[in-house]
Amino acid sequence: MLGIWTLLPLVLTSVARLSSKSVNAQVTDINSKGLELRKTVTTVETQNLEGLHHDGQFCHKPCPPGERKARDCTVNGDEPDCVPCQEGKEYTDKAHFSSKCRRCRLCDEGHGLEVEINCTRTQNTKCRCKPNFFCNSTVCEHCDPCTKCEHGIIKECTLTSNTKCKEEGSRSNLGWLCLLLLPIPLIVWVKRKEVQKTCRKHRKENQGSHESPTLNPETVAINLSDVDLSKYITTIAGVMTLSQVKGFVRKNGVNEAKIDEIKNDNVQDTAEQKVQLLRNWHQLHGKKEAYDTLIKDLKKANLCTLAEKIQTIILKDITSDSENSNFRNEIQSLV
């Protein structure tokens, strides 16, 4: 009886060990099967998602040509909601994942283009050159007008090449052109003489009507070539009309935008407009030869009386300054 009680603990320990090994074996087997199942599922999912686009949480198939994506799919591998592009204005020419269609190309008539094939939902517009236009590049953004031949055509203009013209008779035409241009220098010379004659006439009249003698304008122009006109701008503006001032500054570098700006800044004051216009011209021109430019331009415009009036004003002022300076020097020498 004592022997049985001694063996009983050994028997129970052996049974417990056998049970534990059996359970562990079963768990290991289950884990192994679970891992194989996950690998299988992953392989299947990977195969199913090939060629799909990942957007957000899910992958989806592309929209076909002529359509765009309107809403994402809610399940992996599903098709998104696609809607057609606007006919005649938009297109897509291949399967894609975008939510936008492409704009159809415009054939600009101003660049010599016209429509060859209209835009559809699956194809862009195709342009070509208009009649009498050509384009010799691979991608034509604009077409050039065909050359018009005056002396005959060697090869007609095509969509991809310009006209080839004959050159016969070009020398004789050049001769005629020279004959036509030959009188131009003579006309210019005659016109200049007429202006000079008119100015001399005005000069004689002015000399006869004024008691005080005036200098020869040609001599004045030479002596006063570098006079600083900035101190005389207001006086000069006072003897010129607004139209005369505008005409002068336009010919001598002041652009229309600046003329309009000065006009708008002094709408109610034409006198100030003239002053500002002349000042702007003087700043652009600079001090050197500004006097010569003003006088010569007025004479060319047949405004000899005005030119001589400005000469007289400036000359009197300079003469007065010179006399005052001499007088001061004499006083200082006496002291």
UniProtKB/Swiss-Prot annotation:
TNFR-Cys repeat feature ranges: 47-83, 84-127, 128-166
Listed SMART domains: DEATH, TNFR
GO biological process, one term: Fas signaling pathway
Alphabetic keyword roster: Apoptosis, Calmodulin-binding, Cell membrane, Disease variant, Disulfide bond, Glycoprotein, Lipoprotein, Membrane, Palmitate, Phosphoprotein, Receptor, Repeat, Secreted, Signal, Transmembrane, Transmembrane helix
Extracellular side: 26-173
Membrane-spanning segments: 174-190
Disulfide links within the chain: 59-73, 63-82, 85-101, 104-119, 107-127, 129-143, 146-157, 149-165
Gene3D superfamilies: Death Domain, Fas, Tumor Necrosis Factor Receptor, subunit A, domain 2
Disease affiliated with this protein: Autoimmune lymphoproliferative syndrome 1A: A disorder of apoptosis that manifests in early childhood and results in the accumulation of autoreactive lymphocytes. It is characterized by non-malignant lymphadenopathy with hepatosplenomegaly, and autoimmune hemolytic anemia, thrombocytopenia and neutropenia.
Protein name: Tumor necrosis factor receptor superfamily member 6
